[in-house]
């Protein structure tokens, strides 16, 4: 995790509610919407990411549908760079490319506008939560297919027991996580 003010990180973590048995029995769901409801915690999360990434030369932030938009867009605005959404199929109006990825049962895919990333772009990927890493792996493949350089990804929450951290570091990504929930 980032070397940051422990009091601020504690505020962020404590604002994330845990919902047992959602969406199915045996799952402890980490509800980032409760963080969004707490203006001080939401601002603290954005401010910590701004502080960490300011001056690192990023030219675009890519956020994954849909909660990645809630952290990626304000971060891009604060850093003075563009924000690029990665969405489920059929949601983007211009020409797109697509990347499929595996889910627990089946598969899904993500799309990005073909003109949203160029070979000169240094890209930061942002999402609310890192679990298995499948969504972010697909996102990274899209960015790289368009010629963008992506070596960093930021998350508000990480669930390290689900293997996403190892999966993404194997892709050469440096990860920033504001809080972790291990074995919980």
Swiss-Prot record:
UniProt-recorded Gene Ontology molecular function terms: adenine binding; adenine phosphoribosyltransferase activity; AMP binding
Keywords: Cytoplasm, Glycosyltransferase, Purine salvage, Transferase
Any single Gene Ontology cellular-component annotation: cytoplasm
Cell location: Cytoplasm
Pathway per the UniProt entry: Purine metabolism; AMP biosynthesis via salvage pathway; AMP from adenine: step 1/1
Listed GO biological process terms: adenine salvage; AMP salvage; purine ribonucleoside salvage
Stated family: Belongs to the purine/pyrimidine phosphoribosyltransferase family.
Name this polypeptide is given: Adenine phosphoribosyltransferase
Species of origin: Shewanella sp. (strain W3-18-1)
Annotated gene: apt
